Curated annotation (Swiss-Prot), chain A:
Cofactor notes: Binds 0.5 mol of zinc/mol protein, probably 1 zinc per dimer.
UniProt cofactor(s): Zn(2+)
GO molecular function terms attached to this record: metal ion binding
Effect on the protein of changing residue 11 to A: No longer inhibits sigma-G
Subunit structure: Probably functions as a homodimer. Interacts with sigma-G factor, recognition occurs via the first 71 residues of sigma-G.
Gene source species: Bacillus subtilis (strain 168)
Highest taxon of the lineage: Bacteria
Effect of gene knockout: Premature expression of sigma-G factor (sigG or spoIIIG) activity during the early stages of forespore development. Spore formation continues normally. However its absence has deleterious effects on strain robustness and is strongly selected against in competitions experiments.
Induction pattern: During sporulation under control of sigma-F factor.
Full protein name: Anti-sigma-G factor Gin
The protein's role, per its UniProt record: An anti-sigma-G factor, prevents premature activation of sigma-G factor in the forespore; overexpression leads to 1000-fold reduction in spore formation, spore formation stops after engulfment. Overexpression also inhibits sigma-G transcription activation activity. When both Gin and sigma-G are expressed in E.coli Gin inhibits sigma-G, strongly suggesting Gin inhibits by direct physical interaction.
Result when mutating residue 47 to A: No longer inhibits or interacts with sigma-G
UniProtKB/Swiss-Prot annotation, chain B:
Complexes and interactors: Interacts with anti-sigma-G factor Gin (csfB).
Annotated stretches, region: Recognizes anti-sigma-G factor Gin (csfB): 1-71
Task performed by this protein: Sigma factors are initiation factors that promote the attachment of RNA polymerase to specific initiation sites and are then released. This sigma factor is responsible for the expression of sporulation specific genes in the forespore.
GO BP: any one term: sporulation resulting in formation of a cellular spore
Activity modulation notes: Activity repressed by anti-sigma-G factor Gin (csfB) and Lon protease during the early stages of forespore development. When both Gin and sigma-G are expressed in E.coli Gin inhibits sigma-G activity, strongly suggesting Gin inhibits by direct physical interaction.
DNA-binding region listed in the record: 229-248
Gene for this chain: sigG
Domains (record comment): Recognition of anti-sigma-G factor Gin (csfB) occurs via the first 71 residues.
Keyword annotations: DNA-binding, Sigma factor, Sporulation, Transcription, Transcription regulation
Official protein name in the record: RNA polymerase sigma-G factor
Induction: Expressed and active 2 hours after sporulation starts (at protein level); stimulates its own transcription.
Chain location of the short sequence motif Polymerase core binding per the record: 67-80
């Protein structure tokens, strides 16, 4: 996949538009966030934040 | 192609891609030699089934499963980054224990109440023994029965089983018929306002009813308003000794009234 196609993807964790990263199931995670997530230990308070953010990959948003 | 949809944690398993072992090795080579992002993407998505299968092991343990998918995915991404092709094993061989480890750590670190390892072990053993005893004798075993099998004091069993209970919100709804829901809070009794106390109050009222006004007033000031004998004496213009005497007589009278 070339980079122009990937442009304008919004990362689920930092909510910023990034061009490098991966799609995890339905959502996009930018390279920087992925690195951060992977190096976070489960006891880190940030971990709970990532888990919360990543929840949207398998729970569709509720529209009212 | 079966039309049956299997959904785990909101993920439709039939839509997940599957990778063959050779494909996976090729992708890993691409990732590790060239740092190819798309290879990693394919590897992550191609192994999501692995995460789901691991989550299912945690399904019937009474733990909170909702967030485990994300945790599993993080575990999967960690294992993809650390996988070493030179060990010549299948990726799943390496990834499954990694994902399980990640989930275990997550559950341990995110429990609202920290329970010591040994206590937790006792509790899990107790639960197993309980299950076994139920299937053998088809009745609920007592804490003593479990304690006898595990050879620990039965207080320990009770304590351990208590410790692994999940805390529950007072506002957790337990029944909802569309109207006002019933919360856990509504079913907790108020220990300060129980029946026996209510009966005592009735008896007290009955006892006081037969006293004369002066005695009633003194008792009210002394015991309901918490005043000292000196204060009461000053207020109604008698000596403290008189208050003491009247009080004693009134209590004696009340005792007689209640117990007769």
């Amino acid at each position: 996949m070339d980079e122009t196609v990937k442009l304008n993807h919004t990362c689920v964790i930092c909510d910023q538009e990034k061009n490098r990263g991966i799609h995890l199931y339905t959502k996009f995670i930018c390279l920087d966030c992925e690195r951060k997530v992977i190096s976070t230990s489960t006891s880190d308070p940030d971990y709970a934040f990532y888990v919360k953010k990543l929840k949207s990959i398998h729970t569709p948003p509720l529209y009212s | 192609m079966s039309r049956n949809k299997v959904e785990i944690c909101g993920v439709d398993t039939s839509k997940l891609p599957v990778l063959k072992n050779e494909e996976m090795r090729k992708l890993f080579r691409q990732l590790q030699d060239e740092g190819d992002d798309s290879a990693r993407e394919k590897l992550v998505n191609g192994n999501l089934r692995l995460v789901l299968s691991v989550i299912q092991r945690f399904n019937n343990r009474g733990e909170y499963v909702d967030d485990l998918f994300q945790v599993g995915c993080i575990g999967l991404m960690k294992s993809i980054d650390n996988f070493d092709l030179s060990h010549n094993v299948k990726f799943s061989t390496y990834a499954v224990p990694m994902i399980i480890g990640e989930i275990r750590r997550y559950l341990r670190d995110n429990n609202p109440i920290r329970v010591s390892r040994s206590l937790r072990d006792i509790a899990y053993k107790a639960l197993q023994v309980r299950e076994r005893l139920i299937s053998e004798t088809s009745k609920e075993p007592t804490a003593e029965d479990i304690a006898k099998v595990l050879e620990v004091p039965h207080e320990e069993i009770v304590f351990a089983l208590d410790a692994i209970q999940d805390p529950v919100s007072l506002f957790e709804p337990i029944y909802n018929d569309g109207g006002d829901p019933i919360y856990v809070m509504d079913q907790i009794s108020d220990e300060r306002n129980t029946d026996s106390q209510w009966i005592e109050e009735l008896a007290l009222k009955e006892g006081m009813r037969r006293l004369n006004d002066r005695e009633k007033m003194i008792l009210r000031k002394r015991f309901f308003q918490g005043k000292t004998q000196m204060e009461v004496a000053e207020e109604i213009g008698i000596s403290q000794a008189q208050v003491s005497r009247l009080e004693k007589a009134a209590i004696k009278q009340m005792n007689k009234n209640i117990h007769q």
